[in-house]
Design a protein with these regions (language model features):
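Short, charged/polar N-terminal "headpieces" of proteins
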Residues: 1-27
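Short, surface-exposed, low-complexity cationic segments
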Residues: 20-47
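Helical mechanochemical/support elements of P-loop NTPase systems and associated helical scaffolds
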Residues: 46-49, 53, 70, 93, ...
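Charged, amphipathic alpha-helical linkers/stalks
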Residues: 47-65
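A general alpha-helix detector
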Residues: 53-57, 76-77, 96-97
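Mid-chain, well-packed structural core segment of small domains
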Residues: 59-92
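C-terminal charged interaction modules
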Residues: 79-133
Length: 133
């Protein structure tokens, strides 16, 4: 897999933080856990259930030492979201996220969660479910 980074951009690989001085292309030759800086969610952005799940999974990717404590939180939040949300498409996506987490495919779960943001926003705008506390 090839990743192109801009000057000053950070890349998180297996818990390590790498900052690039100039534009660079990196080729990952084996399977690693990585996260691009532009996909990193800040704490204050985790305002809904799906975003809180994303944040918990993000912690698992960025800090492997914290994965053991973040994983049960992520699973619990998925269960809460499945109970709270009504749309079939959102529920199916959350079930896929849960399956990815069980298989240890955290990056796959994170990618799926990004795709659920718009569905969650739509459901919240309809006023059918509350946002997370």
């Amino acid at each position: 897999m090839n990743i192109t980074l801009r000057a000053g951009e950070r890349l998180f690989i297996n818990g390590a933080v790498i900052r690039i001085d100039g534009k660079a292309s990196i080729e990952l030759l084996n399977e690693v856990t990585f996260l691009l800086e532009n996909h990193v969610m800040q704490t204050e952005e985790a305002t809904t259930l799906v975003r809180q799940i994303y944040f918990a999974v993000q912690i698992m990717l960025m800090d492997p030492a914290a994965a053991g404590s973040a994983a049960p939180v992520a699973h619990s939040l998925v269960e809460s979201a499945l109970s709270a949300y009504r749309t079939a498409e959102l529920a199916a996506g959350l079930k896929g996220v849960a399956a990815s987490l069980v298989r240890g495919r955290n990056f796959e779960a994170l990618k799926a969660l990004r795709g659920l943001f718009a569905l969650e926003d739509k459901e919240l705008q309809l006023g059918e479910t509350p946002s997370a506390a």
